[in-house]
Amino acid sequence: MSINKNIARLRRAKSTRAHIRELGVARLSVLRTGQHLYAQVFTADGSKVIAAANTLQADVKDGLKNGKNSDAAAKVGKLIAERAKAAGIEKVAFDRSGYRYHGRIKALADAAREGGLQF
């Protein structure tokens, strides 16, 4: 029985989100595509987006060759940390959406931690 990689990733993400919902803290969610990276901070109940950043935004694109490398992910991480702190959020749960903690996901998380987010 073979399982599609994306279906397996979505199953892992669903399980993680259930655990995060029980914690009752804001959630930093990441979406990775082939060309870009998106990050959003949701409220504890998941009903509202508090802050968002992605590689399509002009302030992230400046000085980058493309939006699909670790440098771009680090810029998104710093920007999401700034925006979350401006909204009054300092502690979040990191929802990596079933992706491995490696490469772009790790770069984003490290930059968000350097920016002052705790998770």
Curated annotation (Swiss-Prot):
The keyword Cytoplasm does not apply. GO terms for molecular function: 5S rRNA binding; structural constituent of ribosome. This is one of the proteins that bind and probably mediate the attachment of the 5S RNA into the large ribosomal subunit, where it forms part of the central protuberance. Belongs to the universal ribosomal protein uL18 family. This is Large ribosomal subunit protein uL18. It comes from the Bacteria. Part of the 50S ribosomal subunit; part of the 5S rRNA/L5/L18/L25 subcomplex. Contacts the 5S and 23S rRNAs. Pfam families: Ribosomal_L18p (PF00861). The keyword Phosphoprotein does not apply. Keywords: Ribonucleoprotein, Ribosomal protein, RNA-binding, rRNA-binding. One of its GO terms (cellular component) is cytosolic large ribosomal subunit. The gene is rplR. One of its GO terms (biological process) is translation.
